[in-house]
């Protein structure tokens, strides 16, 4: 039995589709099973989430492999970025060890570091360390920015494109190697069959693109190309923090999310790790049919 967290997310939903198609026995840790869509009738359900450590024990019963994709890039009513990423992963690892799990696959991010400027990447570094320090057979998968046609970010950009111009936080020069969610999912599924996997896989697409160009491409893919307006970081920070103070968790965007788009996520390994798993990531032009 495989336990999948984050099954309703961008990568998790793609992984789940591939696992159920391959008839892999899957249990999903979810707060609302309805968000699994049609896949919910093909899997076991364990009610719970990262903010509910007691739910881990039931979810892990009889599990041999954990694929831990769940994450939070903003504070939520049920927990902070640090609690839902770093501390929750540490607790999940402890519960997995107690349950006799064999392999723990953790989904991190390129650039995760205890000294990073962003709270998210610092929390991911804490989570990585908890996994690496465990007695479990462990694998860390660290992708660059992940995208998919119709994902939340593209939907947000489409809404922003109703305006004459689309704002971009800062200078937009942060560099990424964008990788399609389905290519990441293929890597995860391939990893499950690997007898002696590497301890770490850095997943990236075939090209290095800055944030300005990524935004422009996604707008073209949505059929709404627009001029981009670079807004100085201090102005973005003040505006988003003020919005968060008023709207709380309902804010359409947060400073923590915007700040992530000012941090490069690249690897000198390029697509090498994905290819080790038998996956040749497609370019944005190929995937989005630009």
What does each model-identified segment do?
Residues 1-24:
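N-terminal Rossmann NAD(P)H-binding glycine-rich loop of SDR-like oxidoreductase domains
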Residues 5, 29, 69-70, 104-110, ...:
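SDR active-site strand-loop-helix element
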Residues 82-86, 105, 124:
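Short alpha-helix in the Rossmann-fold core of NAD(P)-dependent oxidoreductases
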Residues 75, 110-122, 146-151:
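Conserved catalytic-site region of short-chain dehydrogenase/reductase
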Residues 91, 152-153, 170-193, 199:
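Substrate-positioning beta->alpha
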Residues 34-91, 95-98, 110-114:
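NAD(P)H-binding glycine-rich loop region in Rossmannoid oxidoreductase-like domains
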Residues 187, 191-254, 264-290:
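Mid/C-terminal beta-alpha module of Rossmann-like enzyme folds, strongest
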